[in-house]
Amino acid sequence: MMKRILRPFQILYCIYALCIFACLTIISLFAMIFILPMGYRYLTIGIYKIGRYFSKTLYLFIGMRHQEIYEGVHHFNQAHVFVGNHNSYMDIPPIVQLKHQPIKPLGKFESSKIPLFGLFYRHIVIMVDRSNPEKRAQSLQNLKEALKNKISIFIFPEGTFSMTDEKPLKDFYNGAFKLAIEMQVPIQPVLMVDSVDRMHFSGIFTLSPGICRVVYLPTVYVDNYSLDDLEILKQQVHQMMDDGLRRYRKYPAS
């Protein structure tokens, strides 16, 4: 009964949040005009900072609070392959708030088609079109280029939303872990603990204010791993993240 009474207010809140999102997108596009002539690294850092201000301002106006929890030591002056769980569109804003280092996320090509936002999105992420082998290979080269320039990358190893409340994670793809081994870059697992509560995967009109916790799990160093150990590394990180999510959220026993 109470949910029915509050539902109209939630819809109004969601419309308000979408308006704030649209305004910030327009402002960010204008800000980007001034940094486009910069070289690769400084352009990436500039776009990261714009994205960070975008995210922090969005949170301020829609009543959300970013909180980071560290279960291990993280070296901010070193490039990492960040990997995180993915079951909400609200997993995206925390990525650029992961302080204090520039990050290039791997994102779906389809999202670049969103009116207005798509223009901003193309410069923030490294896009992947999984339906096109050539473009997929180019995305891999772009990820490697970022790491060579000491820019961290962020990959959702599940590949898409985990659209279930029954278990924390889907199976992982190999890409992030293969890349970390090949480039000898440490893996930083992070947990988006509350994103699904802020916006459920069932629809955008489930948006609600509140806390958004991001948990840094201990960094996984890959110095002693070869490509022959790819499956071992992938399962190790999957187990770490599964255990971590079960500590912070309630799931049925596995």
Residue ranges and their predicted role:
Residues 68, 82, 105, 214-216:
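Generic preference for hydrophobic
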Residues 25, 29-49, 61, 75-133:
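Catalytic core of membrane glycerolipid acyltransferases/transacylases, capturing the structured
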Residues 1-65:
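N-terminal membrane-anchoring alpha-helices
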Residues 71-76, 206-207:
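A short beta-turn/loop motif at secondary-structure boundaries
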Residues 4-8, 138-254:
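Non-catalytic C-terminal accessory region of glycerolipid acyltransferases
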Residues 68, 126-129, 222:
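Short acidic-hydrophobic, aromatic-tinged amphipathic segments that line or gate anion-handling sites
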Residues 61-69, 136-137, 196-199:
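Short gly/ser/thr-rich secondary-structure transition/capping motifs
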